[in-house]
Amino acid sequence: QFGRTVPVSGAHKENRAVGMMYWLWHGSYTSRVVDTTKIIEEKGLDYALYNLQEYNPAGVPHYWGEPLYGYYRSDDEYIIRRHMMLLMYAGVDFIAFDASNTITYPNEVRKICEVICELRGEGFNVPQITYYTHTASIQTVQQAYDEIYSHEEYREAWYCMEGKPLMIAQTDPAKDKERTTGQHAHLSAYDPQPLGEEIMDFFYFRVPAWCGVDPVTDDGWPWVDWNFPNDLYGNLMTLSPASHHYAMMSWSAMGYDYPEEQIPRAVWSGGNVSWGRGYAFSDRQNNTARAAQGSFFQAQWNVVKRAQPEIVYLDGWNEWCSGYARNAEYGNVAESYDSFNMEFSRDLELMKGGYNDAFLIQTAMNVKEYKCELPETFIKDVHKTIDINAGAGQWEEVKALYRCTGSRNFGRNARGVQPSLKYAVPA
């Protein structure tokens, strides 16, 4: 697709790591699927933008599209195993759980850790874990420590930097309180105390950075970057398939085809729209025809190739959902900051229809070039007939090795986020 091939890798470069944001909320917030892409296909963009109260009166989070494996729950072990396999093949070293809203999803995390420990014990270099915290950061770190990091049996699942498990968190109580209470009125009583010495010594901390709010610092870790070329936070760059740096994703999908009286352009930073998957800096335009090809994502990878940071952080793997609201001040247009449709969304996970596996292949291709030297020579396929009655020496000239991930076949028999959805795959 798009003429892409994943290059053959040679020696690994030193000081190269790739991480990816990972969401655990599927099945926790809604038992009903509302898919914006399907609504647009059936009734058009105008209906999706202006009739939110009709098709989603309860205000449940929307899926912008359908994942390849269906509307799965985050505790579906078949999905966890597929994710770990795909991310391993793409060269991802760690996943960062989105705990930015204080929720740590301990049951889902334990199941993921068990799968990681099992597969790594069998020799498969699947990604390890960390957490990305933000709101009530100190409280969230304590929860993650109590639930996961105080359990030695999960050690093999922890991603470490400088010999300590990585934790993205604000550990200054005053700053944590200011950010939390300033952004969330319902948490006005939040009054964090310093983390204990044991926890402070246990983790390697980096500070979560909020674009448009926090300055660029060497110890910062942005979940998304609203600048291009991407900022360098010490040894780290953050990339995303799309970026809502100017406006909500739902508003950006309107483009410039709607008159100003329908939506105040003042809230769009001078009338600009956000960078979608098909945005190109050559013409400074979003182009739906380029969305599946990932022109915006590739532009950022080209920055990485020039800057050569030690860590590349990707936002993200499997968000899929976004909260929706409407505001009479803005013409009751559907408001969704984080995602709306294929063009204006940030997921890299495989999609049913749409871009299919294009963003996984694009990620794998760029990660290989970033992390590995590209050899001048490589092992070629050998085509030969094997006599099952002859000896093992017949295999000596066959150098390539292919392994199935995991020592056992694992089927699927699970419900989706909507109880009526059932998914089955034989072992």
Please describe what each predicted stretch is.
Residues 1-387:
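Glycan-processing catalytic domains of CAZymes
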Residues 368-427:
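Order/disorder boundary and secretion-linked terminal/linker segments
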